[in-house]
Structures are given as C-alpha cells and as structure tokens.
C-alpha cells in the first residue's frame, strides 16, 4: 500500500459522525413514553429486522459488542483450559472477552495490506499451539473487508467458528461458485456478532447484537443476557443457572 502524502485524499471520511434525524428522535421518544424502556417489543422488532437484513434465523440484542462476544463464549462453554485464536489487528475487546471467560488468547498474524487473518496465518497459529486446547476461532472482518473462511485448512472443522463483524455491518462475500453471502448470515460460522456503538455503521449509543442459525444457541444467549430470566408462567425451574 502507498502511504505517501501525495497519494492520500485531501478530504477524509468522518469518524464517529452519527446521523440522527427527526425520525430517530421520535422513535426514542415513543420508547420513553411506552411501558418498556428495555427488553420490550421494540427490541424484538429490531432483532427480527436485523436478522432478516443479514439473512440469519435469529438475532439477539445486548448491551455492547463486548458483551456479545462474552455471551458467545459463555453460551458455548468456553472457559478455563480452552484457547481461542484471534487476529492481532482488532479492538482490544476481542481478546478481553476471551479472558473474561477464563480462556487463553492465541494471536494470529494478519496480512499487512488488509489487516485480515488468512489461511496461512491461521495454520501458523495452530502449529504454534499444539500443546493447547484450541476450542474456537474468532475471525475479525475489518473495515468492511471479509475474512475468507472458506479458504482455511481442515483444522477449522474441529473447532467452533465465530465472526466478529463490529466493523463490517452490510458487508458481503462471494463464494467460489459465485453465490453472495451477507456477513451475519453465519453460512460458515456458528454465530456472528456486531456492535452498535456510536462509531459504527448504525448506532444505538451503546449496544451489540449476535446472529445465528442455531435455535438452541439463540435460546441460551437470550437467557444468559438477562441472568436466566424467562417470561414463562409454566416454567418452574431454570436449568441454565441451576435453580
């Protein structure tokens, strides 16, 4: 890449310039005037529309992108004694969420031109971790660029695959056969997480969302995000937190 000053455009793209119009303000006002300030019908509508937009079966909203990552690791029983491979080029939360869960972080190198982890970097990380219990990989799609998970070696079939798409809402990739896949459709992963922080493509101020096609995982994530609270008059016990 050419980083000489003469090659850079004089007008840069704005960072953290969220666009809030009257329609947004009216929607927030309606929520404040309703009986639900959290986990209500507007959250459910947001989840349904988000899942539809990225072609996933389920979407689970939560308080932040970091919380989304943490929930994913907890819901998949990743913890002490496990390791998770992540790229070196990412926001710190990608690594911190692994540590919050008690697991160990294994860093993978990235392509210097794209900042993305590729198949050779992944294989190198695996070879450096033969004495580790590598349970998952979290591939980071950076600045709208997509990691090509389909090119990864067969070792990926032996672990849980997550996608961190905090920087890539609206991005898509093409398969070798020419088929188009939205990031978040989870065509090659168990789940994808997004952030709706103020600097992201869409914002809720703070927020995160997970997409998946796994019904059991979606149910578990919804329970974990609310301390196991389930609105069901017929449910007398909670197996998730052993009550």
Show where each model-derived region lies.
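N-terminal "arm"/small-domain region of PLP-dependent enzymes with the aminotransferase-like
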Residues: 1-37, 41
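Short glycine/proline-enriched coil/turn segments at helix->beta-strand junctions
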Residues: 33, 55-56, 155-159
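Phosphate-binding glycine-rich loop
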Residues: 36-83, 97-101, 107-109
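Active-site phosphate/pyrophosphate- and oxyanion-stabilizing loops and adjacent acidic/basic residues
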Residues: 48, 150, 181
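PLP-dependent aminotransferase-like
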Residues: 74, 78-142, 146-156, 160-176
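Active-site region of PLP-dependent enzymes
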Residues: 167-181, 188-243
């Amino acid at each position: 890449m050419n980083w000489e000053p003469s090659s850079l455009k004089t007008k840069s793209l704005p960072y953290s310039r969220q666009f809030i119009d009257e329609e947004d303000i009216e929607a927030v006002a309606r929520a404040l005037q309703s009986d639900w300030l959290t986990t209500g019908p507007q959250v459910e509508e947001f989840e349904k529309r988000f899942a539809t937009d990225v072609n996933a079966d389920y979407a689970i909203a939560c308080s932040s992108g970091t919380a989304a990552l943490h929930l994913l690791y907890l819901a998949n029983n990743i913890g002490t004694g496990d390791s998770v491979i992540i790229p070196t080029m990412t926001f710190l939360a990608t690594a911190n969420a692994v540590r919050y869960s008690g697991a160990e972080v294994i860093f993978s190198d990235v392509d210097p031109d794209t900042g993305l982890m590729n198949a050779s970097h992944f294989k190198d990380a695996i070879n450096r971790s033969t004495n580790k219990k590598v349970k998952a990989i979290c591939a980071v799609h950076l600045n709208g660029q997509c990691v090509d998970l389909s090119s990864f070696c067969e070792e990926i079939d032996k672990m849980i695959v997550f996608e961190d798409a905090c920087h890539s809402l609206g991005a898509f990739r093409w398969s070798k056969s020419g088929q188009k896949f939205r990031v978040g459709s989870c065509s090659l992963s168990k789940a994808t997480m997004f952030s709706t922080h103020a600097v992201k493509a869409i914002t809720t101020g703070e927020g995160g969302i997970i997409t998946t096609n796994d019904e059991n995982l979606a149910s578990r994530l919804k329970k974990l995000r609310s301390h196991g609270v389930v609105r069901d008059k017929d449910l007398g016990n909670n197996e998730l937190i052993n009550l």
